[in-house]
């Protein structure tokens, strides 16, 4: 019985994967945030980028809540929560787009049981920048160590739906997990 309790606790503590997608229905390129703890904002804002159209969550504990935020004038860590959904009996789900073409400035998740908690107990405690950016063709680029101009170019190309063949050659040094590009491309289009 103790082993089961430790496994359940590890699932909650380990974190979830969040993908802030540039397209509808969790398709298209995305910002990748692996192993995000609950109440950490996965920020989708960048210079002129308004945010993510949809958000894919995976490796969540069952019955966790997915949260989508919009930027607010008062700042806050992630903004104001605009949408919240329960993943139910699964560990993954797509948070659909907001009405009126609005985009998510950030996203987070909370463990089961937090819905009844106070609003303060559900607020994000910190913010995390994306680990990588994935283009529509599945090619993945680490953002750490990349110069700001290169990041801006990569963001623009991702939003425009461009692929790795259209990138300048200097981006090749930042490509990661090359062997998974084809599988990611299939997931993006599925």
Curated annotation (Swiss-Prot):
Domain of life, per lineage: Eukaryota
GO cellular component terms given for this protein: extracellular region
Keyword annotations from UniProtKB, A to Z: Secreted, Signal
Signal peptide per UniProt: 1-15
Localisation per UniProt entry: Secreted
Broad class of the protein's primary localization: secreted
Official protein name in the record: Uncharacterized secreted protein ARB_05566
UniProt source species: Arthroderma benhamiae (strain ATCC MYA-4681 / CBS 112371) (Trichophyton mentagrophytes)
Taxonomic placement: Eukaryota, Fungi, Dikarya, Ascomycota, Pezizomycotina
């Amino acid at each position: 019985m103790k082993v089961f309790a430790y496994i359940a606790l590890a699932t909650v503590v380990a974190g979830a994967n969040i993908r802030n997608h540039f397209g509808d229905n969790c398709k298209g390129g995305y910002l990748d945030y692996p192993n995000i703890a609950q109440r950490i904002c996965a920020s989708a804002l960048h210079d002129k980028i308004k945010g993510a159209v949809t958000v894919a969550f995976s490796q969540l504990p069952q019955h966790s809540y997915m949260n989508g935020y919009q930027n607010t004038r008062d700042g806050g860590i992630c903004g104001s929560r605009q949408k919240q959904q329960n993943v139910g009996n699964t560990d993954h789900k797509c948070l659909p787009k907001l009405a009126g073409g609005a985009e998510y400035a950030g996203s987070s998740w909370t463990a089961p049981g937090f819905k009844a908690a106070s609003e303060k107990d559900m607020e994000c405690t910190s913010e995390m920048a994306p680990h990588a950016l994935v283009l529509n063709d599945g090619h993945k680029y680490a953002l750490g160590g990349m110069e700001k101009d290169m990041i801006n170019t990569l963001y623009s190309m991702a939003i425009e739906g461009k692929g790795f063949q259209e990138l300048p050659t200097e981006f090749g040094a930042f490509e990661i997990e090359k062997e998974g590009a084809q599988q990611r491309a299939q997931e993006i289009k599925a």
